[in-house]
Regions:
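Terminal, non-catalytic protein-protein interaction segments that mediate quaternary/complex assembly
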Residues: 1-213
Length: 213
């Protein structure tokens, strides 16, 4: 586990390459270094900032706009990066847009994942049900378009809004810096909505668990 008020990115990567749980070779003949159940823990009030990783603010801004738009069109995704062409099964859509899955798609009861978690917290501040499910039964098929995030859990303890993000896989270089930033934004968005409803809560901890990194 990497703990702190900011993230020492070099330390994060160093442990993957120099203290891996597994070293394998993929179908392309590339050597892969992997740590399993690898987590980042940001204490309350921390910044989702990775020291030592010069991430692109421009890319994150565009990614955030894409998430908020809820678009599943590949033509919108490739405006961020051509990488997204590899994630589309039909060459037209990308269904793993986190904003679409969490903020736009509604279930049979009429709620988005974000609204459900919010309602759970508002109904009972001690709830253990404030979970946003990303990877669901609709993703149970062989695809290039499977979300890396499995679920997000919010919990209020001692008036602190804590968040846990669990990812089945997370690319340390291309994924982690932007995923941590995105979920930090979502963490603060939930805090803002709960405060607006009158709950006396503060920003709590954020744990980012990567089952494979």
């Amino acid at each position: 586990m990497i703990c702190g008020t900011t993230i020492n990115y070099r330390n994060l990567v160093h442990k993957v390459f120099h203290q891996p749980d597994y070293v394998t070779t993929n179908r392309k003949g590339e050597r892969l270094y992997e740590r399993v159940n690898y987590s980042i823990f940001l204490s309350p009030g921390s910044l989702a900032y990775m020291r030592g990783r010069n991430a692109s603010n421009e890319y994150f801004r565009k990614e955030l706009e894409w998430y908020c738009s809820g678009s599943d069109k590949l033509e919108d995704a490739v405006k961020l990066s051509k990488f997204w062409t590899k994630c589309s099964d039909d060459g037209k859509t990308v269904t793993s847009n986190y904003g679409k899955l969490l903020l736009h798609d509604r279930n049979a009861h009429g709620f988005t994942q974000f609204e459900h978690a919010y309602n759970c917290l508002l109904n009972n501040a001690d709830t253990k049900k404030a979970v946003m499910t990303v990877y669901n039964n609709e993703h149970a098929y062989i695809s290039n378009d499977n979300p890396c995030t499995m679920f997000v859990r919010f919990g209020i303890r001692e008036n602190m809004l804590n968040m846990l993000v669990v990812m089945r896989s997370n690319d340390i270089w291309y994924g982690t810096p932007y995923d941590v930033a995105w979920y930090s934004v979502l963490h603060h968005a939930m805090l803002k909505e709960l405060r607006r409803a009158g709950l006396p809560v503060e920003i709590g901890s954020y744990e980012h668990l990567m089952l494979s990194a």
